[in-house]
């Protein structure tokens, strides 16, 4: 379109060839899972501090996530495997980039749907080790929640200089809540939103 604000660039030019193909198995499909077609997520951030925003995509299938390193001039390189960030959970949803451990390097936090519908896994935290390498350390940081996560955000809610984490979870629509609405006052272990405070003693750890 003439004088358009945006221009669509083909994958042949950018080398971004990510595709999200939702997994369907064991009756896990749109008929049983209301959010089946919500899609994955995307986050941009400068993982190597070269001044260029890199891109991370999440997929609704195991090992389908992709990390693209920005080489400049709208050209990207798929470094997923060498970076170690393909993902190990069955169903990934949103993704957030933030400097979780305050070391000056951008980390990656992946939200996942797990512990229901036959889906395995947990939210994944990839800590940036430098040189475009990451290590999955969600257990170490206490952010390995296994629930119905849609998206997460990091922010300093208590103004103590470190990032805390809020996780938005989707509902699994339990029948008990429909019959007795008073049940909605209680936090559901799978679908209740989660808020983690960043606590530092000898190590950095998040507390729900």
Each language-model region and where it sits:
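Beta-propeller-forming repeat regions
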Residues: 1-208
């Amino acid at each position: 379109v003439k004088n358009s604000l945006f221009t669509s660039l083909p994958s042949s030019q950018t080398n971004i060839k990510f595709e999200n193909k939702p997994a369907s198995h064991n009756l896990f499909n749109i008929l049983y899972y209301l959010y089946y077609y919500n899609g994955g997520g995307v986050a941009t951030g400068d993982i190597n501090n070269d001044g260029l925003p890199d891109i991370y995509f999440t997929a609704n299938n195991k090992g389908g996530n992709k990390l693209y390193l920005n080489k400049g001039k709208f050209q990207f390189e798929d470094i997923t495997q060498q970076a170690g960030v393909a993902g190990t959970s069955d169903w990934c949803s949103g993704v957030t980039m933030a400097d979780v451990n305050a070391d000056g390097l951008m980390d990656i936090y992946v939200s996942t749907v797990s512990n229901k519908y036959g889906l395995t896994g947990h939210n994944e935290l990839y800590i940036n080790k430098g040189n475009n390498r990451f290590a999955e350390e969600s257990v170490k940081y206490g952010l390995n929640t296994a629930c119905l996560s849609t998206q997460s955000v990091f922010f300093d809610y208590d103004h103590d200089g470190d990032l805390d984490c809020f996780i938005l979870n989707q509902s699994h629509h339990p029948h008990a809540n429909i019959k007795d609405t008073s049940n909605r006052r209680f936090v559901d272990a799978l679908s209740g939103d989660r808020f983690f405070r960043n606590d530092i003693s000898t190590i950095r750890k998040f507390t729900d």
